[in-house]
A protein has these predicted regions:
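Acidic, Ser/Thr/Gly/Pro-rich intrinsically disordered interaction regions
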Residues: 1-65, 91-94, 100-111, 129-250
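Short acidic, low-complexity segments enriched in Ser/Thr/Gly/Pro
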Residues: 83-95
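Phosphate/anion-contacting hairpin/loop surfaces
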Residues: 123
Length: 250
């Protein structure tokens, strides 16, 4: 009954993918920079029942693919959302205040922002699980996350270029992402925080410009994180492959 509508919707999303050059790990036949994404190195000596490498790999691919979908949604909806600088109402003394009669497009856009944070964090959490499976003595499985395992490996003084990429990402882009994520996933959703910030800046145009610039800029922000996640997978893959080769030679 709704197939035609769904097909038209998907056509619009695919056009956004093309226009914005949004690419996931499953695109191009699961090939990325010369590697087969589905042939991720596995530690055959790691026998932790709570870690299933095949399921974990598909979770990585799915989170990356889902992030691409939600980034596409952000670009699709952005030009239709409420702009607080264009929705001003005069009050006494000639002052203007910003209103926020949220439309449907804005509501969904806000929801997709929170989804992007969730998918980004889940992706890196699974990357951390994969890396930790090669270093089982560094952390107990319930302690593992991306940041902790990278910090632990750093103490091992491993001199591998691919690890340095992961470390640099962890100490820069990931820290910012995780700071956002803690606010918008653990505590309040993006929409709730935005509503509060808007209410605190109703007549402050400079303050409104700041929160609007952040909200409007999230599609580009998450496009960058989509690219970083694919590159991060490649760096993890190459790092573990090198670790595996060195261990096989010893």
């Amino acid at each position: 009954m709704y197939k035609d509508i769904i097909d038209q919707y998907n056509k619009a999303i695919f056009e956004v993918y093309m226009k914005r050059s949004l690419v996931s790990l499953e695109d191009n036949g699961f090939k990325y920079k010369g590697i087969n994404v589905l042939q991720c190195p596995i530690n055959p000596d790691y026998n932790e029942p709570k870690f299933q490498p095949t399921i974990n790999l598909w979770d990585i691919v799915s989170c990356n693919k889902d992030l691409k979908f939600f980034v596409g949604q952000l670009f699709l909806y952005r030009d239709l959302i409420n702009n607080p600088l264009e929705e001003l109402m005069p009050i006494e003394n000639g002052k203007l205040i910003s209103t926020y009669y949220q439309n449907l497009y804005d509501r969904r856009y806000c929801s997709f922002i929170t989804c992007c944070f969730e998918k980004s964090y889940n992706f890196w959490d699974r990357i951390g699980d994969t890396i930790a499976s090669f270093f089982p003595d560094l952390l107990k499985i319930h302690q593992v996350d991306f940041s902790r395992i990278i910090d632990q490996i750093k103490t091992q003084q491993i001199e591998i270029e691919h690890f340095f990429w992961l470390l640099n990402f962890k100490e820069n882009e990931y820290q910012e992402l995780n700071r956002y994520r803690k606010d918008f996933v653990n505590y309040y959703q993006f929409e709730s925080k935005y509503r509060y910030d808007h209410s605190m800046n109703l007549s402050d145009l400079i303050g409104l410009e700041k929160i609007w610039a952040e909200k409007y800029g999230f599609p580009e922000y998450f496009k960058k994180h989509l690219e970083l996640s694919s590159e991060g997978y490649y760096q993890m893959f190459s790092f573990l492959e090198q670790i595996q080769n060195e261990r096989n030679r010893s």
